[in-house]
A protein has these predicted regions:
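Membrane-embedded, hydrophobic transmembrane alpha-helices
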Residues: 1-89, 94, 448-450, 454, ...
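Membrane-helix boundary/interfacial segments in multi-pass membrane proteins
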Residues: 5, 54-59, 178, 229-245, ...
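Membrane-interface helix-loop junctions at the exits of transmembrane helices
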Residues: 42, 116-120, 141, 215-233, ...
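Perimembrane helix-loop-helix junctions
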Residues: 90, 290-320
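Active-site lumenal/periplasmic loops and adjacent helix-entry segments of GT-C-fold
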Residues: 102-248, 260, 531-542
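Short hydrophobic alpha-helices at membrane interfaces in multi-pass membrane enzymes
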Residues: 259-277, 456-461
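Hydrophobic, aromatic-rich transmembrane alpha-helices
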Residues: 376-401, 448-451, 497-506
Length: 654
């Protein structure tokens, strides 16, 4: 319980300055709070790097920003109350009360989800070690720069995380709360889950302006990401940058951008730009992936109704301009990456790595249609409901569903578009665009249209469809795509979206009605499945490093020292202590000119064969860790700092 209180306090303190900035601008949304909080941290970190200072300066600057914004926030609250006319006050109260009721319900449900996530946190795994290592270095080093977080002493920046904004955010939470960074990464999702739910609701509210479909959209997002995969799904990784970008920052940016198409005020446009910048810094390609459906939305909105053209273009500019400025700074780093603008050998290697998700050959390819429905029953239902958006063409949600879906589907399914797109952003990233299909909104809006068409029959139909789809298409969540979703559902969505685009030209009132019960019953089987398998994932295995070894490295090895070990041990050592390493699994580090991860692995294999200490010394290592279970032949006449049944820590010296 104490740890939970610490984490809540830490996140609240770091988010508070952003909340005050957003309030000073008059934007009362969690989306704006998150966006401005990260922009404040971004500015504070940038100043810290320029001055080669420590995270103490970052924290002081973040808190100073909050103090500076507080008077303006109080003044803005008073002005808003004074300047409203009675008629506007009544109308605003009706809208605000409806929005607030839905947000309270979603926030409460998100809090319950967060507490449930505490029990399935399990162990750090996968990319978690990579990100945790960066947080450790930010907390430990006193002369920070953008290169301080590099895992290798002679390595370079990671193109996806060149500026460690989210890592800095987590490091500040750890510093303020006093919690161990490992606990922040493992249990941070408990605190972030309510925020994710509210942000999903705000994005739904911006599109629908009604409580029921907005709540349904938020619930569908949770079903797709947390319930369908079992074991908490990706929500257990909500403290990691990729998941945070997808489940927190992207809905925040979308909510603000859609609001800006309604009211393109300077405050909303600035907040949209702040969210876009934060998204671009935390996970660059996801900012680009947001532009694609948003442009599709604007084009369809233009074809169906013209009044939104100028506000829509302003909102798009707010999304693009700040992110593009960051991309200009990032471009030299991206240019050193093997997977961007790849040669023939690299493209063939990547194609073979993701072969199950691709159709075609290494020279021209697209994603397979099964990829769009791989997240299970809710995804399949959303694909089938998507065409019904054409019957509500006057609504913003319908334009976003049809336009966003067509934009994503065309890029992903047309080889002569998808191949150069993959060359530009890397195949590792481009295949993820399929996950940006607006499925949650398609389901939330489509079920309302279906309710208008078939009346009360929608309730048993929704329940039967939810059960049938969960049994037939439970989802395919492995790293390799084996079965995926039904291809026919994707083609129904493609054809239906085209038909919906044509149908939308007819000027007719939208066909839709509230469908709360039907929405709940459609999602219920997936929630039952998820909760029935609510256990820690076996994929995140216990840390093989012994507690004694970790304690010895933390106590004896200075921060920033270079430790040599096998790739798997090295990767984990950096996560538990602020040390540099010489080798890591190639799949978990950037394949850049400076990093050359595969060559490093080959060097370690030579060391394992020969025991030549010149190999670790060439990397600058002054400490050596040996896994005696895997490499019993490696024993050296060096000073032993720690020894247990499996691990030995040697002092290698200069």
């Amino acid at each position: 319980m104490l740890l939970l209180v610490q984490l809540v306090f830490g996140f609240a303190v770091v988010l508070a300055p952003g909340a005050l900035v957003a309030r000073a601008l008059g934007v009362r949304r969690a989306s704006a709070t998150l966006a401005w909080s990260l922009v404040v941290v971004f500015g504070a970190l940038a100043a810290t790097f320029l001055l080669s200072a420590s995270l103490d300066l970052t924290l002081v600057l973040v808190l100073a920003a909050g103090v500076a914004a507080a008077p303006a926030a109080v003044r803005r609250t008073r002005l808003d109350r004074r300047d409203r006319r009675p008629a506007e006050e009544r109308k605003l109260q009706l809208v605000t009360c409806a929005f607030a009721r839905g947000r309270r319900a979603v926030s409460a449900a998100g809090a319950v989800l967060g507490l449930l996530l505490w029990h399935v946190a399990g162990n750090v795994g996968g990319d978690g070690f990579f990100h945790l290592a960066r947080v450790q270095k930010l907390l430990a080093f006193g002369d920070l720069s953008v290169g301080s977080m590099n895992e290798f002493p002679d390595g370079g920046l990671h193109p996806g995380y060149a500026f460690p904004l989210w890592h800095g955010f987590l490091a500040l939470v750890a510093k303020v709360s006093g919690a161990d960074p490992v606990d922040v990464v493992l249990h941070g999702p408990t605190v972030l889950a309510p925020l994710a739910a509210v942000l999903g609701y705000e994005a739904g509210w911006a599109l629908f302006r009604r409580v029921v479909p907005a709540v349904t959209a938020a619930a569908a997002s949770v079903a797709l990401v947390a319930m369908a995969p079992s074991h908490g799904g990706a929500f257990t990784a909500l403290a990691l940058p990729a998941t945070a970008a997808r489940q927190l920052l992207l809905p925040a940016a979308l909510a603000l951008a859609i609001e800006a198409t309604r009211r393109p005020t300077p405050a909303l446009l600035a907040s949209t730009g702040a969210a876009s910048l934060a998204l671009a810094v935390v996970h660059p390609t996801y900012a680009l992936f947001l532009w694609i459906p948003f442009v599709g939305f604007l084009l369809v909105r233009l074809l169906w109704r013209r009044p939104d053209v100028r506000p829509g273009l302003l909102a798009l500019a707010a999304l693009v301009a700040p992110a593009a400025a960051f991309f200009a700074w990032l471009l030299p780093v991206v240019g050193d990456t093997a997977s961007v603008a790849p040669d023939a050998a690299e493209r063939t290697r990547a194609f073979e790595q993701y072969a199950g998700q691709l159709a075609g050959d290494a020279d021209r390819f697209s994603v397979v249609p099964e990829l769009f429905g791989r997240t299970g029953a809710v995804a399949v239902a959303a694909l089938l409901l998507l065409p019904l958006a054409g019957l509500a063409a006057r609504r913003r949600w319908a334009a976003y569903v049809v336009g966003g879906a067509l934009a994503v589907l065309v890029v992903c399914l047309v080889p002569w578009i998808f191949t150069p797109f993959s060359d530009a952003v890397s195949l590792s990233q481009s295949r993820r665009l399929a996950g940006f299909l607006p499925l949650a909104f398609a389901l939330a809006g489509g079920i309302g249209v279906l309710a208008r068409l078939i009346g009360r029959l929608v309730v048993p139909v929704a329940l039967a469809a939810g059960i049938a789809f969960q049994l037939l298409y439970p989802g395919d969540f492995g790293y390799m795509l084996r079965d995926g979703g039904p291809a026919w559902a994707t083609w129904v969505a493609v054809a239906g979206a085209v038909v919906a685009l044509v149908v939308g030209f007819r000027a007719r009132p939208p066909l839709e009605r509230p469908a709360a019960l039907a929405s709940a019953l459609l999602l219920a089987p997936t929630y039952v499945h998820g909760l029935a398998h609510w256990t820690p994932s076996g994929a995140r295995r216990p840390n093989p490093l012994s507690p004694g070894l970790i304690e010895a490295v933390r106590g004896e090895v200075p921060a920033g020292a270079v430790v040599y070990a096998d790739p798997e041990a090295s990767y984990r050592l950096g996560a538990f202590s602020p040390v540099r390493i010489c080798v890591a699994p190639p799949g978990h580090v950037a394949d850049t000119v400076d990093n050359h991860p595969r060559a490093r692995v080959e060097e370690f294999r030579r060391f394992a064969r020969t025991g030549d200490l010149a190999v670790p010394r060439a990397c600058g290592a002054t400490w050596l860790v040996v896994d005696r279970d895997r490499f019993p032949q490696l024993a050296f006449p060096l000073r032993v700092v720690h020894r247990d049944e499996r691990w030995v820590l040697y002092r290698l010296g200069g």
